[in-house]
């Protein structure tokens, strides 16, 4: 897609995937697809089937649902705002148990959840994330162990 072509021309898009053995991108994973997280997790679960449970793996998933546009997660919304942002997060959260359940069947798993940036929704008159603002560079972080069941 045009968006992924632009991304690949940027330094991060050219270099970052090279740090991984495998890198996958499909348009159905994009931020404009309302079911992108479901599709990303479906894809990840299918890939996990190729590895025995005792095989250690590193998996990085950049959930695109939180990126704009996210207004489609609230019926009738036409502009992103804190409500649609929260709805996108709830959608992502609703999909994670499927992934976590599979990892718990494999082995103890370290999960690191974080964002690459925040998003302004009117703070100090700013919108979105292509600016230097505390809201943009203050990001959530959590890590935890999923224990094998």
Predicted regions and their residues:
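Catalytic domains that recognize anionic headgroups
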Residues: 1-149
């Amino acid at each position: 897609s045009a968006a992924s072509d632009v991304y690949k021309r940027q330094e991060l898009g050219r270099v970052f995937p090279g740090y991984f053995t495998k890198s996958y991108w499909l348009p159905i994973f994009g931020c404009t697809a309302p079911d992108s997280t479901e599709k990303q997790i479906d894809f990840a679960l299918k890939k996990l089937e190729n590895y025995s449970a005792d095989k250690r793996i590193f998996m990085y998933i950049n959930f695109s649902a939180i990126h704009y546009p996210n207004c489609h997660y609230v019926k009738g919304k036409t502009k992103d705002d804190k409500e649609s942002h929260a709805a996108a997060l709830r959608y992502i959260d609703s999909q994670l148990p499927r992934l976590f359940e599979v990892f718990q069947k494999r082995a103890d798993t370290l999960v690191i959840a974080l964002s690459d940036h925040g998003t302004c929704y009117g703070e100090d008159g700013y919108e979105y994330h292509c600016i230097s603002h505390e809201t943009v560079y203050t990001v959530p972080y959590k890590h935890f162990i999923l224990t094998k069941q």
